[in-house]
């Protein structure tokens, strides 16, 4: 099955399946907000979206990488590549798809002048944290964000 997965640059016709998968990854986002963020990403040269498709040409995963010129925690220099999101449908996991996404993303980031890739996840997301460590990331720091309304 692994060799039958194709990895393709995002095309406009991939938007509906991308949004459907992104809603599974980022379930806390409102759909219109997520749609807006994805549309901005698909229109920018600072992002690379890769879609994995099965032999039936059905989308089974995606990855989004970006080039960041703002501060990335722990990065040695700028620009820094960034793994914005990665998702593989449950029935297609453990086939090496996520690893291939990482390889393709690293290659693109190197081509854009990056020597490191950052990423983030929620402190409580043990599955994501384990995945990041498995594919070669290290934990840079743990942060809790605060907010206060002012009157």
Residue ranges, per PLM feature:
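A short beta-loop-alpha structural element at the N-terminal edge
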Residues: 4-18
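Helix-loop element at the rim of GNAT/NAT acetyltransferase active sites that forms part
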Residues: 19-33, 71
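Active-site rim helix/loop that mediates acceptor-substrate recognition in acyltransferases
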Residues: 29-54, 64
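Conserved beta-strand in the GNAT
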Residues: 51, 58-67, 82, 87
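Conserved acetyl-CoA-binding loop-helix of GNAT-fold acetyltransferases
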Residues: 88, 94-107, 130, 134
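Conserved active-site alpha-helix within GNAT-family acetyltransferase domains
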Residues: 99, 111, 123-142
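Conserved GNAT acetyl-CoA-binding A-motif
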Residues: 102, 109-121
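Conserved beta-strand-loop-alpha-helix junction that forms the acyl-donor binding cleft
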Residues: 119-128, 147-150
């Amino acid at each position: 099955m692994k060799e039958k997965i194709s990895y393709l640059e995002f095309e406009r016709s991939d938007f509906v399946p991308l949004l459907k998968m992104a809603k599974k990854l980022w379930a806390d986002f409102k759909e219109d907000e997520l749609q807006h963020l994805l549309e901005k990403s698909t229109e920018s040269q600072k992002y690379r979206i890769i879609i994995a498709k099965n032999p039936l040409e059905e989308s089974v995963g995606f990855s989004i990488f970006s080039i960041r010129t703002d501060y990335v925690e722990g990065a040695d220099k700028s620009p820094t590549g960034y793994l914005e999101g990665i998702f593989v449908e449950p029935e297609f996991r453990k086939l090496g798809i996520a690893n291939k996404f990482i390889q393709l993303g690293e290659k693109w980031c190197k081509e854009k002048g990056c020597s490191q890739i950052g990423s983030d996840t929620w402190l409580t997301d043990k599955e994501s944290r384990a995945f990041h460590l498995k594919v070669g990331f290290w934990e840079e720091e743990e942060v809790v964000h605060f907010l206060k309304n002012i009157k």
